[in-house]
């Protein structure tokens, strides 16, 4: 029986993680659930799964959550500091980091220092501070098991290949809802259009990142840190069917690929049960439904965010941290229809140019770079609005 903490239990990954746990009650026990704002859903989950503790990030909702759970024997806490602290609870075996964005960094660091296995769904942790995270993982000798479908695929392809050098990682991308569209078309797309992903069911932030291909850029950076490869060894391939989740090419020229239906419960379950493979009722892949599996190069001229992510990855230091900070500000603005889809890249690029570059950042440097990146992105965004 594994005791699980889920950070971000009310989001897309969090709710699907609970579905996996619900289907395997003899294997998993829910120890901690956290959410940021969705207090009613968090309370509903707590009543069903009976964790020892729940945390609501938004402190203004603490009394509401306490009232909803007054008849349950569950400890209730509030605030980001509480989220960062509960992961250190001695009874926890695995921490599922399903929070979105930069907010996942400090809880993940604390969980590593507490010796917990990390089921990593919060890619921004490695985007922002991959070098620091890898050093901590080595120091505290913990395992990071990827939950992202692409990184789970790469991880699975590498099982049994410990001594065999990787030549290249082929990171697949659906291409999002705007695949094949030109730059002029993208100038006028709306948030509602961008939120209609062709293959995956995800939260709003990740869906917008997928549409802009920033998500794939983040995943390339994540792959660099997870698998110890150079940026030049990570090739993005657009694969509209989302059946081949990623591939690994070895130095002898052979390629291994991992395939499956586009259902996040598959990589979630693999991360939770690793190294075992446990039966699931998830739909099996029917090749008759997918007679053609196609691949194409990404259009980095139109989808500039992918190029910006590679630029940040090649530069290293605090550049990916700044990239993420600016992107979070821009996605929030785009979701409110305050900025155009293409202008997001303009602001991100300017922010990356203006924030002070640090070659080997400390945790304090990463925190400061995130703050500076957000401040400058807001300034650049306001400057852009004033010119319209």
Please name every model-derived segment.
Residues 1-388:
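Catalytic, metal-anchored helix/loop core of enzyme active sites in primary metabolism
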